[in-house]
Structure formats: structure tokens, C-alpha cells
């Protein structure tokens, strides 16, 4: 099975394709002043990133396939996502973490375990 080059975010009847490109990540890191992996660092007692930061990451990822969407559009899409009964934690666990994994910025669990095993040898 071939891996899709993007993550999907289903909101209402719309399916948004998400992909963090190197260019998008560089812009995000410049604007946020922090490494993108640090945003999702779960070693600090699992802090939930600020909503605005999470939406900036979404905006950076959504514009690869949905050209012309503005940050306000992403906020409106997130409002619809909330209206469907989701919450900010759902966005993190069901959308952003898979996005970071599929885009190659954090390892999937099985790859992470392999890397740790190699490092311990």
C-alpha cells in the first residue's frame, strides 16, 4: 500500500488535504520563533499548544492543496469542527499529530521505537 503524501481533515462535507512542506515549516518557525517539533513536545507534562499556534500550523499545511485560504478561513473551519462535537484535543490527536508524522517531522511510534533501539546499541 502506498502512503498518501498528505493527511486529511474531514469537517462537515469537506475533506481538506494537509501537508507541511519545508517552505511552510520554515515560515512557521520564523513567525512562531520556535522549532515546529518543540510545539508538539510532550515531555513537558503534555502541555496543549495554544489554539492560535495549532491553527497557524493548520493554515501552513492546508494551503498546499487548498490555495487561497486565509487564516480567518481556517478559524471558521475550526469553528465548524467544534460545532460537530470535536474539541481542541481532538484537533491535536486526530489531525495535527498525524500531520506531523505524515509530513516527516515526528516519527510514527513504530519508527520511534526502532530509532531508540538503534541508539541504545
Predicted regions: what is each one?
Residues 1-10, 15, 30, 34-46, ...:
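Charged interaction scaffolds used for protein-protein
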Residues 18:
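Active-site-adjacent beta-strand anchor residues
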Residues 21:
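Residue-level signal for threonine
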Residues 25-28:
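A short local loop/turn or secondary-structure capping micro-motif enriched for an aromatic residue
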Residues 53-64, 94-98:
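Short, hydrophobic/amphipathic alpha-helical patches that form generic packing surfaces
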Amino acid at each position: 500500500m502506498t502512503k498518501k503524501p498528505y493527511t486529511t481533515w474531514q469537517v462537515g462535507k469537506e475533506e481538506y488535504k494537509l501537508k507541511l512542506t519545508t517552505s511552510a515549516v520554515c515560515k512557521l518557525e520564523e513567525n512562531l520563533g520556535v522549532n515546529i517539533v518543540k510545539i508538539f513536545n510532550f515531555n513537558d507534562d503534555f502541555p496543549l499548544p495554544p489554539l492560535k499556534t495549532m491553527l497557524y500550523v493548520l493554515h501552513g499545511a492546508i494551503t498546499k492543496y487548498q490555495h487561497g485560504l486565509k487564516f480567518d478561513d481556517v478559524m471558521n473551519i475550526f469553528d465548524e469542527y467544534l460545532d460537530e462535537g470535536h474539541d481542541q484535543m481532538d484537533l491535536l490527536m486526530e489531525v495535527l499529530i498525524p500531520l506531523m508524522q505524515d509530513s516527516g517531522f515526528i516519527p510514527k511510534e513504530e519508527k520511534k521505537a526502532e530509532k531508540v533501539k538503534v541508539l541504545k546499541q
